[in-house]
């Protein structure tokens, strides 16, 4: 199965490693390019070191990115801890679908710091 990963931070890294160790093909990784303060272990850097095609995460906001997914015959798009709103055409482009992996109970704990808010309201 061909997978495209859109992600950030440790959640994105965990999914990157899980897909890399699976029988599935990682067709591309979309993440935020490292800045001057990056520690060198962000998703972009790790994916590049592992040899994966790396693209700016903001591409998912553009309808035309759906054409790239279809051209690659992508089966699944995984969106993990990304701050970008994925364009509807991009969501619908993968053959089997797109999946948003979110650590909070949606819609109540949408956004940032979901775990902290869940504990606060417990």
Predicted segments, located by residue:
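One-carbon transfer enzymes
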Residues: 1-122
């Amino acid at each position: 199965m061909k997978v495209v990963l859109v992600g950030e931070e440790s959640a994105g890294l965990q999914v990157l490693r899980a897909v890399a160790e699976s029988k599935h093909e990682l067709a591309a990784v979309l993440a935020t390019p490292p800045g001057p303060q990056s520690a060198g272990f962000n998703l972009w850097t790790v994916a590049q070191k592992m040899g994966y095609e790396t693209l700016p995460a903001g591409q998912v906001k553009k309808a035309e990115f759906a054409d790239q997914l279809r051209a690659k015959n992508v089966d699944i798009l995984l969106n993990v801890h990304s701050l970008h709103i994925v364009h509807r055409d991009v969501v619908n482009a993968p053959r089997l679908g797109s999946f948003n992996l979110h650590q909070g109970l949606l819609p109540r704990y949408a956004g940032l710091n979901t775990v902290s808010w869940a504990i606060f309201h417990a």
